[in-house]
UniProtKB/Swiss-Prot annotation:
Main location: nucleus
Alphabetically ordered keywords of this record: Magnesium, Manganese, Metal-binding, Nucleotidyltransferase, Nucleus, Transferase
Cofactor binding comment, as recorded: Binds 1 divalent cation per subunit.
Subunit structure and binding partners: Forms a complex composed of sart-3, terminal uridylyltransferase usip-1 and U6 snRNA; complex formation is mediated by usip-1 and sart-3 binding to U6 snRNA.
Protein name: U6 snRNA-specific terminal uridylyltransferase
Highest taxon listed in the record's lineage: Eukaryota
Residues annotated as binding Mg(2+): 183, 185
Entry keyword annotation includes Cell inner membrane: no
BP terms from Gene Ontology: U6 snRNA 3'-end processing
GO CC, alphabetical: nucleoplasm
């Protein structure tokens, strides 16, 4: 562990505050970060270590922020309180101070900005661990309220159910899954002491439903708890709690009908604190599901439990990119995706088994024996490689037709018929602890489209030569920015040749394109450029001469590929992603002439930078630019690992797609 990482591990985030202001708040001079620091000190607030001040890395952005360490926790609380009570402004620009560690842990935007100020000091593995350390921090007062609330509910349950036992499960109860915003899941059972006589009498359910208050004098017995339907028990308990003035003072309560019905207790004692408890009865299956996730993490024998950090990061990634709701009001999704952290975690577990071609999880085994030991470092090496492989796997996953079933991916129709007509859905993921239950049945089609887009953009980020892993917290924004930053590699100029005005494209080629043979193969096989029939020759070597070779563009092989690729995937399960991409181009027929191009290749003197010079003799610049963007930013980028390992010429060994194939 680096010395910087050790400092982060020991720092108390309660001393830190976030200052925010907007450049559009005033027509006067917008305050700089230094001006904000001077202002804070001028009104006699005591700063801590000034070296730990984090500035917005983009001072030209509309929204500005700073992260400041105050001298003490009390001083941090004081400036945040005064920011609301008094209000601060510089040159009429309002400055707002909030705690870095809020009532419900780190805010999503604060975590993003905290990582921006941290990225110069850490490598990517360390950055990810900085984030997981941060989001695991929680306020002691929140913890106390959680524990007091649990004890209060536990006492209330004991008055309504004989020999009741309230068991915590889920992320809060797991040392390796708990974070600063975990809520509490509670399962209620009736447990008899050894030798204790248990009544087998069961009252008619309708009697108890008609008079729930009878439980105050005659609590539910173990036999009744195991006999009555779960939903009816939960409804009865809900009515009892909802008529209890002590509970109504402490909690906002609601009954939630679902496959596993629950009562949700939301603590209302502290304004703004999002603390809730989900209470279910006789729900051992959910306890075992949570136990499986816990065991999957603890069976990782890598140093520092890297799988724990990876899974915590991927859930936070989903929240930051609006696949899941956050824990503050402004972080709630306007349109629910119906995804949840359990589904996200199960997607990771499936990937690990599929990628290693090994069954790591045996759900039917006994607790603590359901997961085989493994080592994250041995399987994946580092976090970036893990996420690159994860997103690459799902970028090539056929969500339309395939379902996830443990280690396997199989046809939805096959799985549905094999398990008694399990409902098909846009995302179909079977619960490893209950193979008849599609846990993603309610996930919307729009959510799957959003997930798919995020996966592809995340993969694009991870394939860059230089990036920070926290870019993934703003996946679509950062991917768009990176794509735009690559555009200057294609420069356009106008020249007069033989009395005619020609437009030229100069293209910096990716490192995997080494020889003129490589470029020729990509142009003719992937883009379907056709050597001009009037051209004498040319041999491949001609691309390295100033005159190069002339090509006719007679099909738009870079447009509308998705359906063709999907059809190839479904008909040929033996094909690799590279083979599918190349064969997809084979399906394009020659059409009318779109453009005529003279293309040559050269190397920048004294460097390894290789350029393609494209003289547009006839045709639209936009068409040619789109074709080259597809070749470099999609085809080569998506298949970079294969092309780097095996060389571009491996494409020549891929059979041409037969006309009869889809």
């Amino acid at each position: 562990m680096s010395s910087n990482l050790q400092l982060v591990e020991t720092f108390d985030s309660r001393q830190f505050v976030v200052a925010r202001w907007n450049r559009n708040d005033t027509t006067a001079m917008v305050p700089s970060a230094i001006a904000v620091v001077v202002f804070v000190e001028s009104v006699e607030y005591k700063l801590g270590c000034k070296e730990k001040i984090g500035y917005s890395p983009t001072p030209e952005d509309q929204d500005q922020f700073m992260i400041l360490q105050m001298e003490s926790i009390d001083e941090a609380n004081r400036i945040c309180h005064d920011s609301i009570a008094k209000g601060f402004a510089i040159n009429n620009t309002k400055i707002v101070f909030t705690p870095l560690l809020g009532l419900n842990g780190f805010r999503l935007q604060d975590a993003i900005d905290f990582m921006k100020t941290s990225q110069p000091h850490f490598n990517n593995d360390e950055l990810l661990e900085v984030l997981t350390m941060a989001i695991c921090q929680e306020l002691p007062e929140r913890l106390k309220i959680l524990e007091d609330g649990f004890s209060f509910i536990e006492q209330g349950v004991s008055e309504l159910i004989q020999n009741s036992a309230c068991e915590m499960f889920g992320s809060f109860a797991s040392p390796v899954r708990r974070n600063g915003y975990s809520d509490i899941d509670i399962n209620v059972e009736s447990v008899s002491a050894p030798g204790q006589r248990v009544s087998t009498n069961v009252r008619p359910l309708n009697e108890v439903v008609a008079n729930p208050k009878c439980l105050i004098t005659h609590p539910l017995t173990k036999s009744e708890l195991e006999t009555y339907p779960q939903e009816e028990i939960i409804k009865i308990l809900y009515r009892c709690f909802n008529e209890n003035s002590a509970f109504k003072t402490k909690f906002e309560m609601r009954f939630l009908p679902a496959r596993t019905p629950i009562i949700v207790f939301k603590n209302i004692e502290v304004e703004g604190m999002n603390v809730s408890y989900d209470l279910s009865v006789h729900n051992q299956i959910s306890v075992e599901k949570a136990s499986l996730l816990h065991e999957f993490i603890v069976k990782d024998k890598s140093k520092g439990s890297r799988m724990k950090n990876a899974m915590m990061f991927i859930v936070h990634w989903a929240k930051s990119n609006k696949l899941l709701s956050g824990d503050y009001p402004e972080e709630k999704l306007e349109v629910k995706t119906k995804l949840n952290s359990y589904i996200i975690n199960q997607l990771v577990i499936h990937f690990v088994q599929a990628a290693t071609n090994k069954v790591h999880v045996n759900p039917q085994a006994k607790r603590d024996s359901r997961v085989n030991e493994y080592n994250f470092d041995t399987l994946f090496g580092d976090y970036c490689k893990f996420f690159r492989e994860l997103f690459k796997y799902y970028a090539n996953f056929d969500f339309t037709n395939k379902a996830i079933y443990g280690k396997k991916a199989m046809q939805k129709k096959t799985l549905s018929s094999a398990h008694g007509g399990v409902e098909e859905s846009p995302l179909m993921l079977m619960d490893p602890m209950d193979i008849t239950h599609n846990i993603s049945a309610k996930v919307t089609e729009d959510a799957v489209k959003l997930l798919n887009g995020l996966i592809r953009n995340a993969l694009f980020i991870l394939k860059q030569n230089h990036f920070h892993i926290n870019y993934l917290l703003e996946t679509n924004t950062m991917a768009t920015m990176l794509m735009k930053s690559r555009e200057p590699k294609i420069s356009i100029s106008t020249r007069v040749t033989d009395g005619a005005e020609h437009q030229y494209l100069s293209v910096q080629l990716p490192a995997v394109v080494i020889t003129s043979s490589d470029l020729f193969l990509l142009l003719t096989r992937v883009l379907r450029f056709n050597v001009c029939p009037n051209e004498q020759g040319p041999s491949v070597v001609d691309l390295c001469t100033p005159t190069g070779a002339i090509f006719l563009v007679t099909s738009r092989a870079w447009v509308g590929r998705r359906n063709t690729k999907r059809a190839l995937k479904n008909s040929r399960h033996d094909l690799t992603p590279l083979q599918i991409d190349v064969m997809c181009s084979d399906k394009y027929d020659y059409e009318e002439d779109i453009a005529e191009l003279r293309i040559s290749m050269s190397t920048v003197p004294g460097t390894r930078i290789r350029l393609a010079c494209i003289d547009i003799m006839r045709g639209q610049v936009s068409e040619v630019r789109d074709a080259i963007h597809f070749l470099i930013d999609q085809f080569i980028n998506n298949n970079y690992d294969d092309l780097e390992k095996n060389g571009v010429q491996t494409i020549s060994r891929i059979p041409i797609a037969a006309p009869t194939w889809p």
